[in-house]
């Protein structure tokens, strides 16, 4: 098992960070596709449309061709939310990581480095409108290279954010992750995060039934 250390993001890390983040998000597309195929409305579409064509035209060949056209469309539909999310991030906070995360004492961005390579990332920003009496920090961009998973890197990165939050006087750490990101969901539960709700990012994520899970980690008061 290769050793790693966690440090603050530096500008020279940018290309590696963005590349790892983008690839990590797009890795979820096959899972999203399988999830979409098992939805009742998808099964109805895959069975109903070809059957309707057979009843209207009497051609089974046309029905088979229809299925072959529907499957690439469903792949596109499953992948689009992830691609849209990556594009949005690269045009907002990830466009300038230093400006977004390192221009204020109450925020931060860290990388895990191993053998001179960036193998993990995590960021944190203060919540703009927290509940009354709370000071909350939101965890963002947790990602670990596929070749370095299972080594405790993600857990170490989350602990870095939790310790930073304690040092800065935050009352809670909050985050949002996708239902299909089961590795992340399991990690957060195992570290003591509590689920506070679910939501959908937009109509497309609702259509493909990819919900977002909201978590909170209350920090003990000093």
Curated annotation (Swiss-Prot):
It holds the Pfam family Acetyltransf_1. Pathway: Sulfur metabolism; glutathione metabolism. GO terms for molecular function: L-cysteine-S-conjugate N-acetyltransferase activity; L-lysine N-acetyltransferase activity, acting on acetyl phosphate as donor; N-acetyltransferase activity; protein-lysine-acetyltransferase activity. Its EC number is 2.3.1.-, 2.3.1.80. SUPFAM superfamilies: Acyl-CoA N-acyltransferases (Nat). Residues 1-35 are cytoplasmic. The keyword Protein biosynthesis does not apply. CDD domains: NAT_SF. GO terms for biological process: gastrulation with mouth forming second; glutathione metabolic process; peptidyl-lysine N6-acetylation; positive regulation of gene expression. It is a single-pass type II membrane protein. Residues 62-217 form the N-acetyltransferase domain. It comes from the Eukaryota. Keywords: Acyltransferase, Endoplasmic reticulum, Membrane, Signal-anchor, Transferase, Transmembrane, Transmembrane helix. It is found in: Endoplasmic reticulum-Golgi intermediate compartment membrane; Endoplasmic reticulum membrane. The chain crosses the membrane at residues 36-56. Residues 57-222 are lumenal. The keyword Acyltransferase applies. It catalyses: L-lysyl-[protein] + acetyl-CoA = N(6)-acetyl-L-lysyl-[protein] + CoA + H(+); an S-substituted L-cysteine + acetyl-CoA = an N-acetyl-L-cysteine-S-conjugate + CoA + H(+). One of its GO terms (cellular component) is endoplasmic reticulum-Golgi intermediate compartment. InterPro entries: Acyl_CoA_acyltransferase, GNAT_dom, NAT_camello-type. Endoplasmic reticulum-membrane(ER)-bound lysine N-acetyltransferase catalyzing the N6-acetylation of lysine residues in the lumen of the ER in various proteins, including PROM1 and BACE1, using acetyl-CoA as acetyl donor. Thereby, may regulate apoptosis through the acetylation and the regulation of the expression of PROM1. May also regulate amyloid beta-peptide secretion through acetylation of BACE1 and the regulation of its expression in neurons. N(6)-lysine acetylation in the ER maintains protein homeostasis and regulates reticulophagy. Belongs to the NAT8 family. This is N-acetyltransferase 8. The lineage of its organism: Eukaryota, Metazoa, Chordata, Craniata, Vertebrata. The gene is Nat8.
